[in-house]
Swiss-Prot record:
The keyword Kinase does not apply. The gene is adc. Its EC number is 4.1.1.4. It comes from Clostridium acetobutylicum (strain ATCC 824 / DSM 792 / JCM 1419 / IAM 19013 / LMG 5710 / NBRC 13948 / NRRL B-527 / VKM B-1787 / 2291 / W). The keyword Lyase applies. Catalyzes the conversion of acetoacetate to acetone and carbon dioxide. This is Acetoacetate decarboxylase. The active site is at residue 115. Homododecamer. Optimum pH is 5.95.
Amino acid sequence: MLKDEVIKQISTPLTSPAFPRGPYKFHNREYFNIVYRTDMDALRKVVPEPLEIDEPLVRFEIMAMHDTSGLGCYTESGQAIPVSFNGVKGDYLHMMYLDNEPAIAVGRELSAYPKKLGYPKLFVDSDTLVGTLDYGKLRVATATMGYKHKALDANEAKDQICRPNYMLKIIPNYDGSPRICELINAKITDVTVHEAWTGPTRLQLFDHAMAPLNDLPVKEIVSSSHILADIILPRAEVIYDYLK
């Protein structure tokens, strides 16, 4: 393969890349979001400067990607922390677990999503929306909500989805020294909300050394939502360089 052909490739292996080129369109992307109150000292230990914490809140989320161009069907779960950067409110993506290798690869390589392999599920059990997250063979989170008890305003649902996402991009040199260390922003703007609901909600987190969601313990459920929407994943941009 010629050099000018090599540099045109998006990823490796050269003849079978880990993921295709975007844009990545999500049809009927299903969100189960729970905002809960946690310990402020615990948040201070994990939120990187220059992000600022407004309140001791965390959003636990499970998302079912039923139909994603180029990436297929998969489920994702994790924690996001409401923060602000230069006065702009958004969510710092703390950790994410999903069951799809192309989605893990594209999230880490083309952007800065903190994705690891995990086994989340989102399903309806009788009258209950259920979200679970397993790491390996162990359960680390169980979330439940009454199924479609109360309609949520579509504009409110859209506002939840369209908040800026702040992420860390860290890539070392081959000797382990810092090569890239950046704060990244990606904000979804292309979204169509089909349904939005809320209801009575509970969330359990369990201790795990390699999936430490419970380091941000649940003290009080603040709000919850169940949303179906079409979105297009945005491109990320660098907003802060730690090495300059």
